[in-house]
Protein backbone atom coordinates (compact mmCIF):
# COMPACT_ATOMS: atom_id res chain seq x y z
CA UNK A 1 0.00 0.00 0.00
CA UNK A 2 1.40 3.42 -0.99
CA UNK A 3 2.20 6.09 1.57
CA UNK A 4 -0.27 8.48 -0.10
CA UNK A 5 -3.05 5.91 0.19
CA UNK A 6 -2.21 5.37 3.85
CA UNK A 7 -2.49 9.12 4.47
CA UNK A 8 -5.81 9.36 2.66
CA UNK A 9 -7.15 6.43 4.69
CA UNK A 10 -5.94 8.08 7.90
CA UNK A 11 -7.69 11.32 6.91
CA UNK A 12 -10.89 9.41 6.17
CA UNK A 13 -10.66 7.72 9.57
CA UNK A 14 -10.23 11.06 11.35
CA UNK A 15 -13.19 12.56 9.48
CA UNK A 16 -15.28 9.55 10.53
CA UNK A 17 -14.15 10.00 14.15
CA UNK A 18 -15.11 13.68 14.00
CA UNK A 19 -18.51 12.82 12.55
CA UNK A 20 -19.06 10.42 15.45
CA UNK A 21 -17.73 12.84 18.07
CA UNK A 22 -17.42 16.45 16.82
CA UNK A 23 -16.09 17.64 20.19
CA UNK A 24 -12.93 15.51 20.13
CA UNK A 25 -10.06 17.97 19.80
CA UNK A 26 -7.50 15.25 19.14
CA UNK A 27 -9.36 14.02 16.06
CA UNK A 28 -9.45 17.54 14.60
CA UNK A 29 -5.75 17.93 15.44
CA UNK A 30 -4.76 14.61 13.88
CA UNK A 31 -6.71 15.50 10.75
CA UNK A 32 -4.91 18.84 10.56
CA UNK A 33 -1.45 17.28 10.86
CA UNK A 34 -2.25 14.88 8.02
CA UNK A 35 -3.54 17.75 5.87
CA UNK A 36 -0.36 19.74 6.55
CA UNK A 37 1.60 16.75 5.30
CA UNK A 38 -0.33 17.08 2.03
CA UNK A 39 0.27 20.87 2.03
CA UNK A 40 -3.46 21.53 2.32
CA UNK A 41 -2.88 24.46 4.63
CA UNK A 42 -6.29 26.15 4.42
CA UNK A 43 -8.09 22.94 5.37
CA UNK A 44 -5.52 22.26 8.08
CA UNK A 45 -5.99 25.74 9.53
CA UNK A 46 -9.72 25.18 9.80
CA UNK A 47 -9.20 21.79 11.50
CA UNK A 48 -6.70 23.27 13.97
CA UNK A 49 -9.10 26.03 14.95
CA UNK A 50 -11.76 23.38 15.54
CA UNK A 51 -9.24 21.45 17.68
CA UNK A 52 -8.62 24.54 19.80
CA UNK A 53 -12.34 25.23 20.07
CA UNK A 54 -12.76 21.71 21.50
CA UNK A 55 -9.52 21.66 23.52
CA UNK A 56 -8.33 25.22 24.33
CA UNK A 57 -5.20 23.93 26.12
CA UNK A 58 -3.97 21.86 23.15
CA UNK A 59 -0.65 23.70 22.85
CA UNK A 60 0.49 21.67 19.84
CA UNK A 61 -2.43 23.04 17.81
CA UNK A 62 -1.28 26.63 18.38
CA UNK A 63 2.24 25.62 17.31
CA UNK A 64 0.92 24.06 14.10
CA UNK A 65 -1.09 27.21 13.36
CA UNK A 66 2.10 29.17 13.90
CA UNK A 67 3.83 26.89 11.42
CA UNK A 68 1.16 27.61 8.81
CA UNK A 69 1.67 31.34 9.39
CA UNK A 70 5.41 30.87 8.90
CA UNK A 71 4.74 28.98 5.68
CA UNK A 72 2.84 32.07 4.49
CA UNK A 73 5.60 34.44 5.58
CA UNK A 74 3.52 35.82 8.46
CA UNK A 75 6.05 36.19 11.29
CA UNK A 76 3.69 38.17 13.53
CA UNK A 77 0.98 35.52 13.20
CA UNK A 78 3.48 32.78 13.99
CA UNK A 79 4.66 34.70 17.05
CA UNK A 80 1.11 35.27 18.29
CA UNK A 81 0.11 31.62 18.02
CA UNK A 82 3.24 30.42 19.81
CA UNK A 83 2.62 32.95 22.58
CA UNK A 84 -0.83 31.38 22.95
CA UNK A 85 0.86 27.96 23.06
CA UNK A 86 3.04 28.87 26.05
CA UNK A 87 0.05 30.45 27.78
CA UNK A 88 -1.98 27.28 27.33
CA UNK A 89 0.77 25.05 28.73
CA UNK A 90 3.43 26.17 31.18
CA UNK A 91 6.96 25.10 30.33
CA UNK A 92 6.14 24.26 26.70
CA UNK A 93 9.64 24.25 25.23
CA UNK A 94 8.61 24.05 21.57
CA UNK A 95 6.55 27.21 21.88
CA UNK A 96 9.44 29.10 23.48
CA UNK A 97 11.81 27.81 20.80
CA UNK A 98 9.55 29.02 18.01
CA UNK A 99 9.13 32.40 19.69
CA UNK A 100 12.90 32.75 19.87
CA UNK A 101 13.29 31.76 16.22
CA UNK A 102 10.73 34.34 15.05
CA UNK A 103 12.19 37.09 17.24
CA UNK A 104 15.62 36.38 15.78
CA UNK A 105 14.15 36.64 12.27
CA UNK A 106 12.68 40.01 13.29
CA UNK A 107 16.07 41.21 14.56
CA UNK A 108 14.96 41.22 18.21
CA UNK A 109 18.10 39.48 19.42
CA UNK A 110 17.79 40.09 23.18
CA UNK A 111 14.19 38.85 23.21
CA UNK A 112 15.20 35.85 21.11
CA UNK A 113 17.97 34.92 23.54
CA UNK A 114 15.59 35.16 26.50
CA UNK A 115 13.01 32.90 24.81
CA UNK A 116 15.57 30.37 23.59
CA UNK A 117 17.19 30.14 27.01
CA UNK A 118 13.75 29.28 28.39
CA UNK A 119 13.24 26.68 25.65
CA UNK A 120 16.48 24.92 26.54
CA UNK A 121 15.71 25.19 30.25
CA UNK A 122 12.39 23.39 29.78
CA UNK A 123 13.90 20.84 27.37
CA UNK A 124 17.65 20.31 27.91
CA UNK A 125 17.78 18.10 24.79
CA UNK A 126 16.16 20.62 22.42
CA UNK A 127 18.86 20.60 19.74
CA UNK A 128 17.27 23.07 17.33
CA UNK A 129 16.69 25.61 20.12
CA UNK A 130 20.35 25.32 21.19
CA UNK A 131 21.47 25.83 17.58
CA UNK A 132 19.29 28.93 17.20
CA UNK A 133 20.48 30.22 20.59
CA UNK A 134 24.10 29.77 19.53
CA UNK A 135 23.38 31.81 16.41
CA UNK A 136 21.71 34.52 18.49
CA UNK A 137 24.73 34.71 20.80
CA UNK A 138 27.00 35.04 17.76
CA UNK A 139 24.85 37.85 16.34
CA UNK A 140 25.09 39.58 19.72
CA UNK A 141 28.89 39.30 19.68
CA UNK A 142 28.92 36.76 22.52
CA UNK A 143 31.32 34.47 20.68
CA UNK A 144 32.45 32.33 23.62
CA UNK A 145 28.85 31.64 24.65
CA UNK A 146 28.03 30.72 21.06
CA UNK A 147 30.91 28.25 21.01
CA UNK A 148 29.85 26.70 24.32
CA UNK A 149 26.28 26.18 23.10
CA UNK A 150 27.37 24.73 19.76
CA UNK A 151 29.62 22.28 21.58
CA UNK A 152 26.60 21.34 23.71
CA UNK A 153 24.69 20.63 20.49
CA UNK A 154 27.48 18.32 19.31
CA UNK A 155 27.39 16.46 22.62
CA UNK A 156 23.72 15.76 21.94
CA UNK A 157 24.12 15.10 18.21
CA UNK A 158 27.72 14.76 16.91
CA UNK A 159 26.59 14.76 13.27
CA UNK A 160 24.63 18.04 13.49
CA UNK A 161 26.31 19.81 10.58
CA UNK A 162 24.94 23.29 11.32
CA UNK A 163 26.75 23.33 14.68
CA UNK A 164 30.06 22.53 12.95
CA UNK A 165 29.42 25.33 10.46
CA UNK A 166 28.61 27.81 13.23
CA UNK A 167 31.68 26.76 15.20
CA UNK A 168 33.81 27.42 12.12
CA UNK A 169 32.40 30.95 11.95
CA UNK A 170 32.87 31.56 15.68
CA UNK A 171 36.45 30.29 15.70
CA UNK A 172 37.26 32.49 12.69
CA UNK A 173 36.03 35.48 14.68
CA UNK A 174 38.33 34.50 17.55
CA UNK A 175 41.28 33.97 15.19
CA UNK A 176 41.49 30.27 16.08
CA UNK A 177 42.02 29.18 12.50
CA UNK A 178 42.93 25.54 13.04
CA UNK A 179 39.73 24.94 14.98
CA UNK A 180 37.78 26.84 12.33
CA UNK A 181 39.27 24.66 9.59
CA UNK A 182 38.50 21.48 11.53
CA UNK A 183 34.83 22.31 12.01
CA UNK A 184 34.47 23.69 8.49
CA UNK A 185 35.80 20.42 7.07
CA UNK A 186 33.43 18.43 9.28
CA UNK A 187 30.44 20.50 8.16
CA UNK A 188 31.34 19.88 4.51
CA UNK A 189 31.87 16.17 5.20
CA UNK A 190 28.37 16.00 6.69
CA UNK A 191 26.89 17.59 3.58
CA UNK A 192 26.41 21.16 4.81
CA UNK A 193 26.72 23.88 2.17
CA UNK A 194 29.26 26.17 3.84
CA UNK A 195 29.18 29.74 2.53
CA UNK A 196 31.90 30.41 -0.09
CA UNK A 197 33.29 33.34 1.90
CA UNK A 198 33.79 31.09 4.94
CA UNK A 199 35.54 28.44 2.85
CA UNK A 200 37.76 31.15 1.34
CA UNK A 201 38.67 32.64 4.72
CA UNK A 202 39.47 29.21 6.17
CA UNK A 203 41.62 28.40 3.13
CA UNK A 204 43.51 31.70 3.39
CA UNK A 205 44.62 30.88 6.94
CA UNK A 206 45.77 27.33 6.29
CA UNK A 207 49.46 26.83 6.93
Where are these regions (language model features)?
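TPR/TPR-like alpha-solenoid helical repeat scaffolds
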Residues: 2, 169-173, 193-207
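Ankyrin-repeat and related helical/solenoid repeat scaffolds used for protein-protein interactions
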Residues: 125-189, 193
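Structural signature of tandem alpha-helical TPR/SEL1-like repeats
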Residues: 2-16, 38-50, 71-84, 105-118, ...
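Non-membrane alpha-helical segments in proteins
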Residues: 26-37, 60-67, 71
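Helix-start (N-cap) detector for alpha-helical repeat units in TPR-like alpha-solenoids
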Residues: 25-26, 59-60, 93-94, 127-128, ...
Amino acid sequence: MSKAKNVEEFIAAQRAAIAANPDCGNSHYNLAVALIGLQKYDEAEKALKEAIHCSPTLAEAYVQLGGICLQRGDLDGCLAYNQQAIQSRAGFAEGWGNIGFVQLQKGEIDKAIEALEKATKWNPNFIQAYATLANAYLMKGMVDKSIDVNLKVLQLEPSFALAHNNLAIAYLEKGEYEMAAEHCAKAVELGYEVAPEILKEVDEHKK
